Regions:
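Extracellular carbohydrate-recognition regions
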Residues: 123-158, 282-289
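A short, solvent-exposed beta-strand micro-motif common in secreted/extracellular proteins
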Residues: 62, 80-99
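C-terminal motif of bacterial Sec signal peptides marking the signal peptidase cleavage site
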Residues: 18-21
Length: 293
């Protein structure tokens, strides 16, 4: 049997070992500095449309390394100290999918100089803008009480994307909507104009929009070999969105689809189907922008 004296000796030995271990670990464990980014806004010029954005992540770099991608708002531990030159790029969810984050190629990277200290938190509120080399093929905000998307592929004339003004409007005076019903349960509409397909593999091309709706919607491209308005064209679906009671922002990547097709012309296409059990449904749109370099 272990005596009380031996138990006390063992207890103090273990206690000493514990403190020694903690001291050893603390001496070797690096102490981080912190960077807190609370928000990332978009500023636009008059010819670039709405400031609406959905910047969900930041991509962080210093002079030599990629430091990581972080969801907003972000408190980022860094093993960096003293004056640091950082580059911060705005990240989005490509096609609205959380598993496909991308640093959005059309937003200017933000360059900041910070003086980082151990355990100190530096707070940044960021604002970006479109790169001057961004090319806006069209911007549709419906504020002229007209629609850029009235080319009807299937459905009835009243099923085109029509401007409206009521309490569902996203911003400004007008938004646009497609209505599907029992009489026209599947509706496909396209941009009024055909565009020349001059894109190369790897060239970024995105369709931005704000949306909400009582039905899902698929975004695609209709390809043509000529400018003939009678040509039926080939529709290639790309991605879509589900029903949503609230307005959301989404960024569709059209680049790979446009580059892989050899067709000379294309339209942007929206396809909507009436959900089972509903008599009618509306899908709302605003701030539709087609952007490339």
């Amino acid at each position: 049997m272990i005596s009380l004296k031996h138990k006390l000796v063992l207890f103090y030995f273990l206690l000493l070992l514990t403190f020694s271990s903690c001291s050893f670990l603390n001496q070797n464990e690096p102490i981080p500095s912190y960077l807190y980014i609370s928000e990332f806004r978009l500023k636009t010029q008059a010819n670039q449309g709405s400031t609406s954005e959905r910047i969900t992540d930041i991509w962080l770099f210093n002079d030599t390394d990629f430091l990581g991608m972080f969801p907003l708002p972000a408190k980022i531990p860094l093993l960096l100290y003293g004056e640091q030159n950082l580059t911060i790029q705005a990240g989005i969810k490509e096609n609205g999918i959380g598993a496909t984050p991308e640093n959005y190629p059309f937003f200017n990277p933000i360059k900041v100089k910070v003086n980082l200290k151990a355990l100190k938190t530096d707070t940044l509120k960021l604002e970006t803008s479109y790169l001057s080399t961004s090319k806006f093929h069209f911007i549709e905000n419906f504020e002229n009480n007209s629609s850029f998307f009235s080319f009807l592929v299937s459905g009835l004339p009243e099923n085109r994307v029509l401007p409206y003004s009521d309490n569902n409007v996203f911003e400004g005076k007008f938004s646009g909507k497609i209505q599907v019903s029992k009489s026209a349960p599947i509706v496909t509409v396209g941009s009024n104009a055909k565009y020349k397909n001059t894109f190369n593999p790897g060239q970024p091309v995105y369709l931005e929009m704000d949306y909400k709706g009582e039905a899902p919607c698929v975004i695609g491209v209709q390809f043509y070999d000529t400018e003939n308005i009678e040509e039926a064209g080939i529709i290639v679906p790309i991605a879509g969105f589900k029903e949503s009671a609230d307005w959301k922002k989404i960024y569709f990547n059209l680049g790979s689809t446009l580059a892989l097709r050899k067709s000379l012309y294309y339209r942007v296409i929206f396809n909507t189907a009436l959900p089972e059990g509903k008599e009618n449904a509306n899908v709302h749109f605003d701030n539709i922008k087609l952007i490339s370099f």
